[in-house]
Amino acid sequence: PTNPLRPENLLKDAFRAYERERYDSLFTVTGNDKKFGKIVDNKFIPFTYKIGQRSQDLEPLFFENGLLYITKAKLIFEDIIISKDALPYEVNHTFANVDIDTQEDFDYAAFLFKKMY
């Protein structure tokens, strides 16, 4: 994984939900409060909101954060990690926003780790 940081008890709590709800897969997501848009012909086109819309009034959106995937073995043998009816397990923790792709990302993750522990 490109994010080795995990909130304490994430696996235990997520696995409990996975078993309780009887899904065949689970993946973690995090709420998104950013105002996304596209740049087309040097113009910004809002994608997830309307100009002037307050952040707190945005439609709740989520992103796959890559912290944890739980999948039944039979699905993995079919090259399926996230099934159509997978449980999106919400994790809103500082670690969910860390993605280590560069040295700067690694330095930031190390800083967070030291600060938290």
Enumerate the language-model features and the residues they cover.
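Conserved core of the sugar-phosphate nucleotidyltransferase
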Residues: 3-92
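Hydrophobic helical membrane-anchoring modules
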Residues: 90, 95-117
